[in-house]
């Protein structure tokens, strides 16, 4: 987006979207909507479509918000074929396996939790590796701190632990649920400052009204991103509204 007029138009449209976003839910509603599971310290399994993933202790098992991202990867809303893909917070590796099935050229699977990057690598090898031409680089990293200096991505996804209220003090639950909005603004700053997107590249971030939507998206717009909604979803019996944001750089 090198045309100044196009950039100005994208900024106006982004701010118009920003004004329409909902305020955060009350604290008690946020806490009620994010009650932690009690099994994070156990060996588990997780099934998505026809893939069954192993989930060791400490690795988070995906919920409905994660599956919203998985579905958009699988249905082509997020285009991966022939592209370089970075998944921030790779967990047990579902995004990586889907990306291989959708023809991604290479995948950077990042997570701050070492057992999660190991689990992603193991599940990827077992479920996708033998028949896939996609290369996987599992990286244990605080955001992009350990991301290769010369690497760039066409697509980056992040389902951040941006819930604004503390729903637990268990470190594994906090890490996966309620770090807060700062982790997203740091993520966006690093993408911009290190120029991590290829020309025409896209960032997809999942946020709901259990997070500080206005602060996070406002920071993105002020930092030069255009912001669109690629998908939005409500949940039966809940006031939670979840958004998959598509962000682009000039």
Briefly describe each language-model feature range:
Residues 54, 137-140, 228-230:
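General small-molecule cofactor/ligand-binding pocket signal
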Residues 200-206:
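Conserved beta-strand signature within the Rossmann-like core of class I S-adenosyl-L-methionine
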Residues 124-128, 191, 220:
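Conserved hydrophobic residues forming the short capping helix/wall of the S-adenosyl-L-methionine
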Residues 1-44, 48:
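N-terminal auxiliary segments of SAM/dcSAM-dependent transferases
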Residues 171-197:
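Glycine-rich S-adenosyl-L-methionine
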Residues 71-151, 155-158, 164-165, 169:
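Conserved SAM/SAH cofactor-binding pocket of Class I
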Residues 207-250:
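Class I S-adenosyl-L-methionine
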Residues 28-100, 237-248:
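SAM-dependent Rossmann-like transferase core, predominantly class I methyltransferases
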């Amino acid at each position: 987006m090198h045309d100044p007029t196009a950039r100005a138009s994208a900024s106006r449209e982004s701010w118009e979207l920003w004004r329409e976003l909902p305020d955060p839910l009350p604290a008690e509603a946020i806490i009620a909507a994010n009650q932690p599971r009690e099994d994070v310290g156990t060996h588990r399994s997780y099934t998505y479509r026809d893939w069954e993933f192993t989930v060791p202790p400490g690795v988070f098992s995906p919920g409905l918000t994660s599956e919203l991202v998985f579905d958009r990867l699988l249905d082509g809303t997020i285009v991966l074929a022939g592209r370089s893909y970075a998944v921030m917070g790779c967990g047990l590796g579902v995004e990586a396996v889907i990306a291989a099935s959708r023809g991604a050229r290479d995948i950077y699977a990042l997570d701050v939790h070492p057992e999660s990057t190991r689990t992603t690598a193991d599940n990827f090898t077992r479920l996708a590796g033998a028949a896939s031409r996609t290369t996987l680089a599992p990286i244990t990293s605080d955001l992009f701190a350990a991301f290769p200096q010369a690497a760039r991505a066409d697509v980056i996804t992040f389902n951040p632990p941006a819930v604004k209220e503390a729903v637990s003090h268990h470190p594994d639950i906090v890490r996966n649920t309620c770090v807060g909005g700062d982790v997203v603004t740091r993520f966006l700053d690093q993408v911009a400052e290190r120029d991590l997107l290829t020309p025409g590249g896209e960032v997809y971030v999942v946020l709901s009204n259990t997070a500080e939507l206005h602060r996070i998206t406002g920071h993105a717009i002020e930092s030069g991103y255009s912001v669109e909604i690629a998908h939005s979803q409500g949940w039966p019996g809940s006031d939670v509204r979840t958004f998959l944001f598509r962000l682009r750089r000039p």
